[in-house]
Regions:
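Canonical protein kinase catalytic loop motif
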Residues: 1
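Long, positively charged amphipathic alpha-helical accessory segments at protein N-termini or as interdomain linkers
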Residues: 7-150
Length: 150
């Protein structure tokens, strides 16, 4: 769901997953992960949201090679489990770390549709649960951007 990696509501990185395949056959995922190691001022001025990077968060940031190695090692552990068991075993950890849990949000959907509600979590299948005046709504597909409602 929200693909931003946040630290105190400042974007530290992002995750993008593209799926390809057949409903009845094999499905493939291409996973892109970006982490802001050190942003220069000219880059920050072009970004339309609060950002941060490892250099600002740590006295001595790790090398990019070390970050990549640890990330790949962790993916080597979680991806086989995800393939075998789905999202359900990761749900509780995801809920504990989700920045918008129990917060009012505005969802920007395709075709300029906007919906607002309270994020109540995710289901075992990974669908986002949004409490709206019309009731609890599940979102499973689409380009969705979550923005905290002020």
């Amino acid at each position: 769901w929200p693909n931003d990696i946040l630290h105190r509501f400042h974007k530290l990185g992002g995750i993008l997953i593209e799926l390809s395949g057949d409903v009845l056959g094999p499905t493939y995922a291409v996973i892109g992960i970006g982490i802001n190691a050190r942003l220069d001022e000219s880059s920050v001025s072009k970004i339309n949201q609060a950002t941060t990077d490892l250099a600002n968060l740590m006295e001595t940031p790790p090398s990019r090679s070390l970050v990549l190695g640890k990330l790949l090692a962790q993916l080597g552990v979680v991806l086989p489990r995800f393939e075998a068991e789905g999202f359900a075993p990761f749900r509780d950890e995801w809920l504990a770390l989700h920045a918008y849990q129990n917060r009012a949000v505005r969802m920007l959907l395709p075709r300029n549709t906007v919906e607002e509600g309270i994020v109540t979590g995710v289901a075992d299948d990974g669908s986002l649960l949004l409490d709206r005046p019309s009731g609890l709504t599940r979102y499973t597909v689409g380009e969705i951007s979550l923005t905290a409602v002020t």
